[in-house]
Every structure is written in C-alpha cells, then in structure tokens.
Amino acid sequence: MTILKTTILFVLAAVAEIGGAWLIWQAVREGKAWWWAGLGVVALGIYGFFAAFQPDAHFGRVLAAYGGVFIAGSLGWGMLMDGFRPDRWDVIGAAICIVGVGVIMFAPRPGG
C-alpha cells in the first residue's frame, strides 16, 4: 500500500507542478491570456501540498526523490503537450532518475 500511495502522490504532484509551470510558460512565452498564468500559480500551490501527504516522514528524502519524478514527468509532459520527442539520452537519463527514486524511497532502512 505504501508504494501505491507514494506513486499516486508523486504522479499527482508532477501533474500539478509541471502543469502549473506549463500554464505559466504558455502565458509568458506563447502569448496565451494572463489568466493561464493565474491557473498555473494555483496549480503550483496545490503541488506544494502533495509532499506533506507522503508516508515518509523526511522532507528532504521525499523532495529529493520527487526530483527524479519531475525529470521524467517533464519529458512526458513535453511529449504529450508540446510534441517534444526525447532522444535516447533523455530517455536513459529519465530511467536512471526513476531508478534513483525507487532506491531513495523504498530501500530497506534500519528500523523501517
């Protein structure tokens, strides 16, 4: 259950953070209406709550692991929303990051 909960929270965090940043990018760089940026700010605020719901008690561990999810998620978002096509090095780098997420979050620890 912990792995499932952690995974769901990381995915929700990625959608909120990457989506929020993308909305702001659209307003500032792509000429969309400024209310897109406002929605982006709201999404980024929502993102901030997801880490607090992670089962692990250590902020540094959760945010460090989430960084790997953010990297892979950003590439995926770019593919879905902007037509970005990652090269093999992007994919290899993202895969390494996801392995790192697993090590950080789920490695056996003393007393755990």
Curated annotation (Swiss-Prot):
The protein's name: UPF0060 membrane protein AAur_4166
InterPro entries: UPF0060
Cell compartments where the protein resides: Cell membrane
Keyword set includes Transport: no
Membrane topology category: Multi-pass membrane protein
Database matches in HAMAP family: UPF0060
Keywords linked to the UniProt accession: Cell membrane, Membrane, Transmembrane, Transmembrane helix
Species the sequence originates in: Paenarthrobacter aurescens (strain TC1)
